[in-house]
UniProtKB/Swiss-Prot annotation:
Interacts with RPA1 and RPA2. The gene is ZUP1. PROSITE patterns: ZINC_FINGER_C2H2_1, ZINC_FINGER_C2H2_2. Residues 226-248 are annotated as: MIU. This is Zinc finger-containing ubiquitin peptidase 1. Gene3D superfamilies: 3.90.70.130, Classic Zinc Finger. Belongs to the peptidase C78 family. ZUFSP subfamily. Signal peptide: none annotated.
C-alpha cells in the first residue's frame, strides 16, 4: 500500500498514486486574477486568454522583465504575477524555478527563507504592476470596474487586506506600503543584486539585506550546533587520547620494572642472597637429587664457614702448575708455533656452586692476585696477603669505595657488594688493585679494528706487552709480566700468554673461570696432547665481541701515587684504542 504525503490517502499501486498526485497538481493550479482553481492546465490557459485578456497582456510584460532580470525565457509560464500571495509548496517551487543561476540553492530547508524569497519576487512584480497601472491611467477605471464586477474585491499583495474597489487598493498600497515602492521601474536597466549565498536576484538592496540576514541566522544556528557537536567530539577525543596515554604509560612502566628486575637478577642485585646462601642452596639441591651424601654436605658446609670466617679461599677450585706444564709442552712439541710468550706463574681458579653464573670477575682477580703474590716485585704492597675468598673480595672493594675510589661506580652498585651476587668488571678490579698500591691501567678497545668484527689491535697490544722482555729470545719465553684481566660483555677471562705461529698469525692463551678443574688437570700430564690446549687457545676469529677492556699490571705504587690515582678515579677514564 502507498500513502499520499499530501492528504494521507492510501492507494494500492504506483500508477494509482501517480494519477492521484496529478489530481493534486490540477487542484493546486489557481488563476492569478480571479483565484479560479480545480481545472487542468490547458483549461486554465484558455480561461486566462478569454476572461482576462487585458490582465494577461500585463502578465506578458512581466515575463519580458523577468527575461531581462534572469537571462532566460525557459520558464515564462511560471512567472505569473501571484497577487493572492498564497504560500504553498507549488508556489514556492515556481518561485525557485525563476532563478536558473542556482535553482538548487534557492530551495532552502528553512520555511522562513522560502517565504522571504517568494515575497521578494512578488514584491518586485507588484511594483511593476502598480507602475504599469499608473502609466495606463486611462484604462485604470475600466479595468478596476471589470475586475471588481467579475472577480470580486481586490486583495493587497503585501498585507492581504481586501478593499472594495481597485482605486482604494491602489491608495492603500501607495500610503501603507510606500516604503516598498521607492524604486522606479521605468526601464529594465535598473541595478540588480545577487544573493552571495544562494544566487537569488533582487532589485532592492534592502530586501537583499533582509534576505541575506535570514541566511546568516540560519548559518549561525547551524554553526552553533556544529560547535556543540564539535566540542563534544573534541572532548571525547581528548578523553580517548588520555586513556590511551595512560595505558601506554602503564605498559611502559610495567616493562621498565620487568627489565629492571631482570637486570637486577642478572647482575646479582635482587636481594636473593650472596655467595654463602647460593652455596648452601645448591648443596641442598645436590643432596636432594642424590648426588651428594649428607655427610659430604656437612663437611663442605663446615669448610665454607671456616673459609668465610678467615676470609681466605679454601683452594678447592684452584689448579696450580699450568704455566710450567705449558713451558714443557712448547719446548718439546707445537711444531707449528714460531714463538710463545708466557706470563709469570699463575694459578687457575674456577667457579663453584656458590658463585656459578656471576663470580667470573672475582675468580679472575684471584688468578691475577695469585700471580702477584708469587712475584717478589709486589712483596711490599701485598705483604702478608693470601688469595681471599669471594665475600672477602667484596669487602675489600667496599673498603676501596670508602677510601674515595670511583664514587660513580659505588653509587651504581648502591655502595654494597657483600651479601649480593653483584658482578664486578674492569673498573672494580682496577680500584681494588690501586687500593692495594698495585700500579695498573685500563685499556678500552671500544670497537673492532679488523674485518668481520675482529680486534687485531688487541692482539698486537698484548704481543707488545709480553714481548717487551727478552727480544730475540728462544722459542718459549717465560716473562715476569703478570697475566692480563680481559673483560667483555657478560664475561671476563685471564690472558696468560700469546703464541705466534709460523704463518705469523697470533693466538692468545686464556684461562677461563668457567672451565672446571678436571679439564685443567689434563694440562698437567707429562704427554700433553695438542687437543688439550684447545680450551686455552683463542684466535682472532674467536674474539668478536663489540668491545673489550683489559687491566694490565705495571708495577707497584708509592703512597703518593696511590693518592693521585684515587683523585683521578673521581671521573673515571681509560685509554681508548683506536
Amino acid at each position: 500500500m502507498l500513502s499520499c504525503d499530501i492528504c494521507g490517502e492510501t492507494v494500492t499501486s504506483e500508477p494509482d498514486m501517480k494519477a492521484h498526485l496529478i489530481v493534486h497538481m490540477e487542484n493546486e493550479i489557481v488563476c492569478p486574477f480571479c483565484k479560479l482553481s480545480g481545472v487542468s492546465y490547458d483549461e486554465m490557459c484558455f480561461h486566462i486568454e478569454t476572461a482576462h485578456f487585458e490582465q494577461n497582456t500585463l502578465e506578458r510584460n512581466f515575463e519580458r522583465i523577468n527575461t531581462v532580470q534572469f537571462g532566460t525565457s525557459d520558464n515564462k509560464k511560471d512567472n505569473t504575477l501571484q497577487c493572492g500571495m498564497e504560500v504553498n509548496s507549488s508556489i514556492l517551487s515556481g518561485c525557485a524555478s525563476n532563478h536558473p543561476k542556482n535553482s538548487s540553492q534557492c530551495l532552502t530547508k528553512d520555511s522562513t527563507l522560502k517565504h522571504e524569497t517568494f515575497y521578494s519576487e512578488n514584491l518586485t512584480e507588484s511594483r511593476k504592476f502598480l507602475k504599469s497601472r499608473e502609466k495606463q491611467s486611462g484604462l485604470t477605471e475600466v479595468k478596476g470596474s471589470i475586475y471588481e464586477t467579475t472577480y470580486g474585491p481586490p486583495e493587497c499583495p503585501f498585507c492581504g487586506k481586501i478593499e472594495e474597489h481597485s482605486e482604494d487598493m491602489e491608495t492603500h498600497v501607495k500610503t501603507t506600503h510606500a516604503n516598498l515602492l521607492d524604486i522606479s521601474l521605468e526601464d529594465c536597466d535598473q541595478p540588480l543584486y545577487d544573493c552571495p549565498m544562494c544566487g537569488l536576484i533582487c532589485t532592492n538592496y534592502h530586501i537583499l539585506q533582509e534576505h541575506v540576514d535570514l541566511h546568516l541566522e540560519e548559518n549561525s544556528f547551524c554553526q552553533g550546533m556544529d560547535r556543540v557537536q564539535c566540542s563534544g567530539d573534541l572532548q571525547l577525543a581528548h578523553q580517548l587520547q588520555q586513556e590511551e596515554d595512560r595505558k601506554r604509560r602503564s605498559e611502559e612502566s610495567r616493562q621498565e620494572i620487568e627489565e629492571f628486575q631482570k637486570l637486577q637478577r642478572q647482575y646479582g642485585l635482587d636481594n636473593s642472597g650472596g655467595y654463602k646462601q647460593q652455596q648452601l642452596r645448591n648443596m641442598e639441591i645436590e643432596v636432594n637429587r642424590g648426588r651428594m651424601p649428607p655427610s659430604e654436605f656437612h663437611r663442605r658446609k663446615a669448610d665454607m664457614m671456616e673459609s668465610l670466617a678467615i676470609g681466605i679461599d679454601d683452594g678447592k677450585t684452584k689448579t696450580s702448575g699450568i704455566i710450567e706444564a705449558l713451558h714443557r709442552y712448547y719446548q718439546n712439541a707445537a711444531t707449528d708455533v714460531r714463538q710463545v710468550w708466557l706470563s709469570s706463574v699463575v694459578d687457575h681458579f674456577h667457579s663453584s656452586l656458590g658463585d656459578k653464573g656471576w663470580g667470573c670477575g672475582y675468580r679472575n682477580f684471584q688468578m691475577l692476585l695469585s700471580s702477584l703474590l708469587q712475584n717478589d716485585a709486589y712483596d711490599d704492597c701485598l705483604k702478608g696477603m693470601s688469595v681471599p675468598c669471594i665475600p672477602k673480595i667484596q669487602s675489600m672493594i667496599e673498603d676501596a669505595w670508602k677510601e674515595g675510589f670511583d664514587p660513580q661506580g659505588a653509587s651504581q652498585l648502591n655502595n654494597r657488594l657483600q651479601g649480593t651476587k653483584a658482578w664486578i668488571g674492569a673498573c672494580e678490579v682496577y680500584i681494588l688493585l690501586t687500593s692495594l698500591r698495585v700500579k695498573c691501567h685500563i685499556v678500552d678497545f671500544h670497537k673492532s679494528t679488523g674485518p668481520l668484527g675482529t680486534h687485531p689491535r688487541l692482539f698486537e697490544w698484548i704481543l707488545n706487552y709480553y714481548s717487551s722482555e727478552g727480544e730475540g729470545s728462544p722459542k718459549v719465553v717465560c716473562t715476569s709480566k703478570p697475566p692480563i684481566y680481559l673483560q667483555h660483555q657478560g664475561h671476563s677471562r685471564t690472558v696468560i700468554g700469546i703464541e705466534e705461529k709460523k704463518n705469523r698469525t697470533l693466538c692468545l692463551l686464556i684461562f677461563d673461570p668457567g672451565c672446571p678443574s678436571r679439564e685443567m688437570q689434563k694440562l698437567l700430564k707429562q704427554d700433553v696432547e695438542a687437543s688439550s690446549l684447545k680450551q686455552l687457545r683463542k684466535s682472532m676469529g674467536n674474539l668478536k665481541h663489540k668491545q673489550y677492556q683489559i687491566v694490565a699490571v705495571e708495577g707497584a705504587l708509592s703512597p703518593e701515587e696511590k693518592v693521585a690515582r684515587r683523585q683521578d678515579s673521581q671521573v673515571f677514564t681509560a685509554e681508548k684504542i683506536p
